[in-house]
Amino acid sequence: MKRTFLSAKLHKVITTAVELDYEGSCEIDGVLLDAADIGAFEQIQIYNINNGNRFTTYTIRGKDNSGVISVNGAAAHKVNVGDMLIIAAYGVYSEKELESYTPRLCYVNDQNILTKISS
């Protein structure tokens, strides 16, 4: 049997932009994507700490060390600049894979600069 578990989390990132007229997605600083091992165009869940909104979208790789967290398209209605978000990715694992499973938890400062990785 396969089960779905958290594979990575970007904890308490700050929204730097919202782009309603963009096709969709969430642009994320490339350094943060690499730290979390989240790929470009990978499905993510976003949890807005400020207003409780939760939604699904996908990633676009932003410029490294830019601090960018831009929520785009229809999802831009669910977020304001300055909102604090949790961005999560999930994976499907076999029982064997779960024996060595550890999620990557990434923490940032108030400028979205990586400060800590726990795994």
UniProtKB/Swiss-Prot annotation:
<dbReference type="GO" id="GO:0006523">
    <property type="term" value="P:alanine biosynthetic process"/>
</dbReference>
<feature type="binding site">
    <location>
        <position position="57"/>
    </location>
    <ligand>
        <name>substrate</name>
    </ligand>
</feature>
<dbReference type="GO" id="GO:0004068">
    <property type="term" value="F:aspartate 1-decarboxylase activity"/>
</dbReference>
<dbReference type="InterPro" id="IPR003190">
    <property type="entry name" value="Asp_decarbox"/>
</dbReference>
<dbReference type="InterPro" id="IPR009010">
    <property type="entry name" value="Asp_de-COase-like_dom_sf"/>
</dbReference>
<keyword id="KW-0963">Cytoplasm</keyword>
<keyword id="KW-0210">Decarboxylase</keyword>
<protein>
    <recommendedName>
        <fullName>Aspartate 1-decarboxylase</fullName>
        <ecNumber>4.1.1.11</ecNumber>
    </recommendedName>
</protein>
<feature type="active site" description="Schiff-base intermediate with substrate; via pyruvic acid">
    <location>
        <position position="25"/>
    </location>
</feature>
<comment type="similarity">
    <text>Belongs to the PanD family.</text>
</comment>
<comment type="subunit">
    <text>Heterooctamer of four alpha and four beta subunits.</text>
</comment>
<dbReference type="GO" id="GO:0005829">
    <property type="term" value="C:cytosol"/>
</dbReference>
<feature type="modified residue" description="Pyruvic acid (Ser)">
    <location>
        <position position="25"/>
    </location>
</feature>
<feature type="binding site">
    <location>
        <begin position="73"/>
        <end position="75"/>
    </location>
    <ligand>
        <name>substrate</name>
    </ligand>
</feature>
<dbReference type="GO" id="GO:0015940">
    <property type="term" value="P:pantothenate biosynthetic process"/>
</dbReference>
<keyword id="KW-0566">Pantothenate biosynthesis</keyword>
<feature type="active site" description="Proton donor">
    <location>
        <position position="58"/>
    </location>
</feature>
<comment type="pathway">
    <text>Cofactor biosynthesis; (R)-pantothenate biosynthesis; beta-alanine from L-aspartate: step 1/1.</text>
</comment>
<keyword id="KW-0704">Schiff base</keyword>
<keyword id="KW-0456">Lyase</keyword>
<keyword id="KW-0865">Zymogen</keyword>
<keyword id="KW-0068">Autocatalytic cleavage</keyword>
<comment type="function">
    <text>Catalyzes the pyruvoyl-dependent decarboxylation of aspartate to produce beta-alanine.</text>
</comment>
<keyword id="KW-0670">Pyruvate</keyword>
<dbReference type="Pfam" id="PF02261">
    <property type="entry name" value="Asp_decarbox"/>
</dbReference>
